[in-house]
Amino acid sequence: MADDGRAKEPQEQETPGEGHNKPKYIWPRWMHKRTFVRALEGTYSNLQQGLLDQPRVFHSTDYEWEGGPQSYGKPMINPMRTEVAQSIETHFHVFGPKGHNKKHGHMNSAVFYVLEGHGHDIHDGERYDYEAGDCLLVPNGVVHQHFNDSDDEQMLVLIMKAKPLFLFMHMLFQKSATMPPDEPVPGHEDFAPPSDL
């Protein structure tokens, strides 16, 4: 009460009191108008259309076999051939009777689907047998080698691996422990990969 008996008008404090009596504080950064996301411009739609326009079917007969004389490979799907599948590589490999390839190892894992024939692999000294219709897994970093066990038939496999993804992650290590044979298997000097694949 004032000296004259009237009620006092509330006055604002110059310094806020404790707890809930403190005035609301406004952060200076919220007081400024800012643009946090600017308009985006680019060629993404062109890239997307380019991917949609890429071929979806690849004919194996359009590509050449490489290697020899005991085994041959044919790269099919990889980032150099198509922009659609940038993280996977797929190729065929055919082994002549009693043929084998080099002993090697790489960082990426691989899946082999055996299309024809039968054979075995050696993974870090362990033997794994397989036949047509089987899938073989080659784990990351395993030193391995593939062998056709037939005396007179070829062995054909489809190999799938995420090698491009591993290369992107800079997991580059790949080495050969032995070179591929440069002489044909005796009695199978005329072995050639299939022309219809």
Listing of model-derived features with the role each one plays in the protein:
Residues S87-T90, V111-Y113, L137, D152-M171:
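A short hydrophobic beta-strand segment most commonly corresponding to one strand
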Residues Y130, V142, H146-N148, V157-K161:
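Catalytic cores of eukaryotic secretory-pathway lumenal/extracellular enzymes that build
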Residues G73-N78, E89-G105:
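Conserved short histidine dyad/triad with adjacent acidic residue
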Residues A2-Q86, F173-L197:
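A short, N-terminal "cap"/entry segment at the start of jelly-roll beta-barrel domains
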